[in-house]
């Protein structure tokens, strides 16, 4: 949760930065100004990241639309963010929204081995001064690939793309404090019981082990970086 909240907040702030010419953008200020129409922000996914991105965007006076697929969450978002438009996913609706948006922000995780939800053709039809920010990674937007903090953006189909996987590294002090609050109980469990017993007793901790003895043991991490994965098991901790 805390990393999603930080990533969602930073995603909107980065969109603002990369709309400016000194960062390779088109020279667009994503801010509501007197006498000018408010820029449009389309957020795919209404979880913790999407909610925080929407809060930043609404604070800037932007027109915000959130696309969510679960009716319960749609109702929650409409209650929490009355100034935002929250819609259920429908291909024709989403594609039309994308063609008119200034900032497209993806927070949806892809299902492995499933086709991209947003094709290259859809991206090609976007406004040429738009910005795409993807805080998740590959698999949702066809033209998206991972970037780094040292080289965060690229142009594809005339649209600026940003896909930094470790965005919370931009604010390490805040991220460390937030992560410690969330991970503290797990750290204490490992210190008290040892890693093997702690993992055996807590499925969430077991599923969170990413690397061990120089090997990637988490399938999603390996897949995202095109590296081999050694499936994790408790016997590896003997």
Where are these regions (language model features)?
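Electropositive phosphate-/nucleotide-binding environments in soluble metabolic enzymes
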Residues: 2-9, 47, 51, 67, ...
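Rossmann-like adenosine-cofactor binding region
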Residues: 79-158
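Adenosine-phosphate binding glycine-rich loop
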Residues: 1-14, 18-30, 139-238
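Glycine-rich phosphate/diphosphate-binding loop of Rossmann-like nucleotide-binding domains
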Residues: 24-108
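Residue-level "edge-of-site" marker
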Residues: 70, 111, 167
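Generic hydrophobic/aromatic pocket-lining and core-packing "Φ" positions
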Residues: 12, 53-54, 74, 123, ...
